[in-house]
Structure formats: structure tokens, C-alpha cells
Amino acid sequence: MSYNYFGKKILILGMGLTGISCINFFLKKGIKPKIIDESKHPSNFIKIPQNIEYSLGSLDHQWILESDLIVISPGISSFKPILIKARLLGIEIISDIELFSREVTCPIISITGTNGKSTVATMIEKIAKKSGYKAFLGGNIGVPVLEILDKEADLYIIELSSFQLENTFNLKSKIAVILNISEDHINRYPNGFQQYKNTKLSVYNQAEICIINSNDKIEKSLIHSKNKKWISFGTNRSDYRICSKSNDPILFFKNKKILNTSEILLYGYHNYNNILVSLAISDAMQFPRNDAINVLKSFSNLPHRFQIIKNEKGVRWINDSKSTNVNSTQVALNSIKTTGTIRLLLGGDSKSANFNILKNIFRTLKIKIYCFGRDGIKLSKICEKKSIYVENLKKAVILISKQVKSGDTVLLSPGCSSLGQFSNFEERGNLFIKLIKEIT
């Protein structure tokens, strides 16, 4: 289906990377959109072409209600009153992913989930290129999808957040994957977790092949399941499964051994799961199995994802700053084997999530919890006997450096977004690395 944007009043919301990519997309088509940003001083303002009309400081602008088409950036809530009003007036509101999906003719692999998206998407990109594909990776990983549009592409791999899926309606994926679904971004969704979950599930709606995590109870009745192929991974009853009867878990397809985890660089059950689903995707795409295995054996952690920064004098320092929700902290804790104390750095903006699920884990572990940031005081009350509130990350690292002993593991796995003290999880992780080098 061909979309004609000429003659339409087009408005872009947000001057981040996504917003800039949308401007460039329309300009290439000979169309001049308008753009609004809530900030009075957006960091990308300098990138706005001089001939583009803009408004800063508020979304409550008449332009919204005068538009024919609004392209909304993922950082802006779809549930703002003025946007609800715009929908009621029949104004079309879409994401950059929707624009992208209208342009693409080659296969798309869509990857979403609460945790692990960037790791799996990067694995698949490497496997695809190893297999001879001209593959492009974009989306939530930091490269807007409109920037990777290429007439010569064989394959697109896109990482998708729930925010990006909210206003995406015609994404026809060759393969769609939900890695996992756990509580996150609850403050974004008026109807709570189920609304967040349903948004994630929408990735399957127009997919040919749906890969599902058997450990998550996904109601197939919520998905338009006509003419779909379903592939499962996770538990013993899955198509792709992990057998954990030995110290080194083994990955299977049906009853056939694929890979022993002792052969790979990555560590931790969550990483074994990432490798498992990557094998499922690769097989579904009919990539040569040997290419996939060779890539996965040599794959190392992406920055800020359970990244071992230092391992000296019997002390491990692990940077898991990408942990922005409670489930990812839980996974990180379950991946640590140590005879000493786990010294956990927890804190930031909890996004109204329920951290009480960590209570039982804290009780069973030899652990000291250093809570910092916006919700640090609240988090320190989850397990008061083992917790201490520290104002910021630097003070926490200084304190830990004085208390740490041989055999201990220091883990930055905040379980929260970085808002309040940092611009993003990368800035938080980089400061942690810098502090380790300076203080320890």
C-alpha cells in the first residue's frame, strides 16, 4: 500500500533523535512538517533545519488540533489529554515505526520484551551479516529506524519498546519476538500492567512467525493468530529449551543438543536465554546453524549489561546499569555465585514499580544494599536490616570501597531508571566505571 503525505498538515512531537529523523524523512519527500517539543531548550534544537516551523515549551498547542497527521516520539505519553482529544477528532497519530513499516518491502525481525532486547537484536545482526545478509539494526537500540532505510537492504532487525508500539499499527514482521514481560513503566499506563502487556503483545498481530517465552503466560486469545507459526523457548516443554541439570546448562532444540554453555563467553542464566532465543530466530530465518553458533560462542556483553569491570584481590565489580526495572535486578542477583557478600547498588526512579518481590531474595542472600537516588529512601525500607541509604552513586562507591572484602561482588543493578541524577543509564554506568578506576 502506498501512502501519500502531500497536502497533509504534518506535525512531529519531540526533538530527540526520533523527531529529527522524522523531519529528514519528510523533507526527502519534499514535505515540510512542523515540530513541537515540551522542553524550552531541547538539546537537538540546533539540528532543526531553518525552514521548519517549531514551537517549544509545551504540547498544549493549537497545531495539534489543526493537524492531519501527528508523528509522536516514544518519550511522549500517548495518554496526554490533548492527544486523546486529537484522536477523538479523528486526527491520525502514529510512531516513526509506523512510518518505517509503510516504506519497507524486505523482511523485518521485530524484537521486544522488558529485558534483553539490545543484546538479542545485536546477536541477530551479527549472525545475519555472518550469513551474508545486508542487514540493518535500529529502533530502541539508539538508531532511529528511519535512518536505516536502504533500498538495498535484505533484512531489518528492529528493537522495539512498548512506547514505540503504542502507535504502530501496520508492522508486518517476518518474525516477532517477545523475550519476556515483567512489571515496568507502570507510571506510563493509566490501566497498569495489563495495558503495558497488551501493548507488547501487539507486536505479534501481523507477524508470520511468533516466538514466545514459555515462562511467560501469554494469552494467545489476545493475539490475532490467523495463519501464524508459533515457536517457543524457555521451559522443558519448549521447542528451544535450557537443560540445567549440570553446572554448565545445555541448550536443546527438541531433543537435540545445540550448544553447551561452557563453550560461550557470556555468563548467567539470562544470557543463556538470550542465546537460546537467538538460535530460535536464526533457525526460523534459515541462517546456517554453524554461523549462528560461531557468533554466539564469541559474543561478549554489551556495555552496561552485567559487564564485569574489575576482578582483582578477590572482588568483582559488575556494571549492570542497563537494569532499569525490578525484574532485571532479580535476574542479575540470580546470576551471581559468590562465597562473600553481594554489595548491591539500587536506586533511581522506580517508576511506581513494586519492589517487594525482591524481599524474599534479599532474605536468602548474604547481601548489603546501598540505596541511592530519587527513590533511595523508599527502597531502603524493603529490607531495612540489610539496607543503607546513601545520597548518590559516588558516595555509595566510596563507602563500599571501605567495606568490601575478598570474595565479595559489587553489583550496580539499580532496578530503576536513571532520571533525577543522570541523563540515561549510559551516563550512570560510565560514572560507576570511572569511580571504580579512581577509588579502588
From Swiss-Prot:
Protein EC: 6.3.2.9
Pathway in which this enzyme or protein is active: Cell wall biogenesis; peptidoglycan biosynthesis
Keyword Ligase in annotation: yes
A cellular component term, taken from the record's GO annotations: cytoplasm
Enzyme class per UniProt: ligase
Gene Ontology molecular-function annotations: ATP binding; UDP-N-acetylmuramoylalanine-D-glutamate ligase activity
Pfam families in alphabetical order: Mur_ligase_C, Mur_ligase_M, MurD-like_N
Keywords from the UniProt entry: ATP-binding, Cell cycle, Cell division, Cell shape, Cell wall biogenesis/degradation, Cytoplasm, Ligase, Nucleotide-binding, Peptidoglycan synthesis
Keyword ATP-binding: yes
Recorded family membership: Belongs to the MurCDEF family.
Primary role: Cell wall formation. Catalyzes the addition of glutamate to the nucleotide precursor UDP-N-acetylmuramoyl-L-alanine (UMA).
Protein name: UDP-N-acetylmuramoylalanine--D-glutamate ligase
Species classification: Bacteria, Pseudomonadati, Pseudomonadota, Gammaproteobacteria, Enterobacterales
